[in-house]
């Protein structure tokens, strides 16, 4: 095996402890192939299943300028024929053994994940290797998928404006920074993408040195190492180096993007700013604080906008933590006639958080909630395969999981106030996006800051710049 892999083999110990002691990372092995591919293997023999997560660094941030959606299209095409199998044969092969495979793009990666019976591990490795190394990327399949993706966006503009608000929001907040690119593209950017653009992306942005393969389940590590090494050690590296991204700048004042949806009887609003990266050490305090402000049903935001006033059916906030600082955002929706009232209340609730902080009893409640939810995300082989890939992707070690419960237990009201002051933006420094009937709400929105307008019918998610 030493001739096949670099001698970077880690045997990690400990197991999942009782809930009161928190979650610990079970034993797993890490190895790196000579071409740069990282392989993570965690044996779990509770059920005869194997789950995998194969992650390629890159994603939407590596889309060409003006070509947002290329990574997403590539992810969609990985299952539409690979190796000796066309799209139908590939799907039938997976289904015939009761397996599951799906591919998706995100801001910073393209991932392929799935699960198979333990007896089918050789087929699993073969299919994943074909998808990544030998995708067919046929013109006809490309044309069909691109047209379908454009239709999905148009359908969302007719029936799911809530799903579009954060896309407009992040595009508005990050501007020309790659984090502002819509992962699935826009009507305009998708229409401009050619088949050759997708092939070029595959050659330049996909390769062994970008790949993390994480597997958890019922297998013998030595045997699976050999199979993965045989299937992937000969793969080429990506044609270009991985782009190193700069930090995005926080907005220092308020500004508004108004998207005119004249037929809508509701307004959908989003507000956010640049916040923290995945590796930020204040994670426990941030998680507790956000949970209490907008991360659970009884949060401050939802209590004010739904439970107490009935202005909305839902109001929430969350962090998007990436390699570089991503965004913190809050969002909700309401009837057109109560748009300004609801937005005022959302901003006032944020002011309350900054002015009063969080009382110790409330912090204890938030800690208990997060402590109870966290283990539920680390129970199955599918979850562990994904989690190991995430740790590797962001350069995090096992302490990110092992120490989390104890760190949560130590969060105080003072810690919460510190991250509120340092990370959560004040109501005076927000990018605000509102989708709604502009004629009915434009004048009321003027008090929040300078307004930039566009139409829902516009084929982009930004008013001027190329996506």
Model-derived segments and spans:
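Short, surface-exposed beta-strand/loop micro-motifs that present aromatic residues
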Residues: 29-30, 38-43, 199-204, 253-261, ...
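Mature N-terminal segment immediately following signal peptide/propeptide cleavage
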Residues: 22-55
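Positively charged n-region of N-terminal signal peptides that target proteins for export
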Residues: 1-5
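M16 family metallopeptidases and their MPP-like homologs
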Residues: 42, 47-75, 86-133, 150-152, ...
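Non-catalytic, conformational "gating/processing" segments within enzyme and secreted inhibitor domains
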Residues: 166-167, 195-231, 425-429
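An aromatic/glycine/proline-enriched structural segment found at the starts
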Residues: 21, 175, 212-277, 434-467
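Peptidyl-prolyl cis-trans isomerase
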Residues: 134-142, 193
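N-terminal signal peptide c-region/cleavage motif recognized by signal peptidases
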Residues: 13-14
